[in-house]
């Protein structure tokens, strides 16, 4: 076990030094049940610190290296690889049962078809939990941003927030755009707001065209509808970002959250 952990820590250190990778500060916690070993990590990424959001230094991301067995629907490869992704039920459990974070959000990128008047194009969409903008301490340039009420029911909230740059370049910064309708993958969505100037994304260095509520995943990513991602414990697809409570360190957060994550994941795989 000790040798394995040393090898893993060395590999993680090498990854952070590799060209093209964002520098990270990584703390690891190893947990074992029988022959299975899983390592859950909470890390502070340079990309997070550079975001124009409230108290960016408090933001952390999660990853894990798995020794679990079981079926997974993951963007991240097989269960032996380093994962950035978590299921939606896992996200809700970690968000609601932790004692070390003041907030936690979930997000994923996906390509969508956007139609506005006589223009149609494919754009990146950032599909986010309802508390995404509020947890980051962001305010709209126009209209409103998402709230938890936009995640109340599956496929029941066809609303969209335009990214600031997309609003300027494709909508000519029209001040009356709020309340208008555009089509996402052929479905009508109401524009409720424009994102803040200068903010791109919490999970990618490149800005999306639009932000969509996670409750609309089946329409935003129709190829996933058969997986029922919002209820499927085996579908790993979301990046999670959390804000540390004042005075809580990454080490303390990991020591608290790691065992919770491990027990939840073990239960998921019992199925």
Language-model features and meaning:
Residues 183-223, 242:
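Basic-flanked hydrophobic alpha-helices used for secretion and membrane insertion
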Residues 31-35, 39, 245:
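Hydrophobic alpha-helical membrane-associated segments
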Residues 28-33, 259:
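Residue-level recognition of pore/gate-forming positions within transmembrane alpha-helices
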Residues 1-29:
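N-terminal Sec/SRP start-transfer signal
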Residues 225-230:
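Short, P/G- and charge-enriched loop/turn segments at secondary-structure junctions
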Residues 10, 36-178, 183-190, 198, ...:
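Structured, solvent-exposed hinge/loop segments at the ends of secondary-structure elements
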Residues 239-245:
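A bilobed periplasmic-binding-protein/Venus flytrap-type ligand-binding module shared by bacterial periplasmic
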């Amino acid at each position: 076990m000790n040798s394995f952990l040393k090898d893993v820590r060395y590999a993680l250190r090498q990854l952070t030094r590799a060209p093209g990778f964002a520098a990270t500060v990584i703390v690891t916690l190893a947990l074992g049940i029988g022959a299975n070993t899983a390592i859950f990590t909470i890390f502070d990424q340079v990309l997070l610190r550079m975001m124009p959001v409230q108290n960016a230094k408090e933001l952390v991301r999660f990853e894990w290296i798995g020794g679990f067995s079981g079926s997974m629907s993951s963007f991240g490869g097989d269960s032996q690889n380093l994962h950035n992704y978590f299921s939606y039920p896992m996200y809700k459990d970690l968000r609601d049962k932790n004692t070390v974070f003041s907030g936690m959000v979930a997000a994923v990128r996906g390509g969508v078809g956007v139609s506005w008047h006589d223009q149609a194009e494919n754009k990146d969409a950032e599909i986010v939990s309802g508390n995404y903008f509020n947890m980051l301490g962001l305010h709209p340039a126009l209209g409103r941003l998402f709230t938890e009420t936009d995640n109340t029911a599956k496929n029941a909230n066809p609303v969209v927030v335009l990214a600031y740059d997309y609003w300027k370049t494709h909508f000519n910064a029209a001040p009356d755009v709020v309340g208008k309708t555009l089509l996402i993958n052929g479905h009508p969505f109401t524009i409720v707001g424009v994102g803040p100037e200068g903010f791109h994304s919490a999970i990618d260095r490149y800005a999306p065209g639009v932000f969509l509520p996670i409750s609309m995943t089946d329409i935003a990513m129709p190829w996933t509808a058969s997986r029922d991602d919002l209820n499927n414990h085996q579908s790993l697809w979301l990046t999670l970002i959390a804000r540390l409570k004042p005075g809580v360190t990454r080490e303390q957060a990991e020591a608290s959250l790691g065992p919770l994550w491990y027990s939840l994941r073990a239960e998921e795989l019992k199925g």
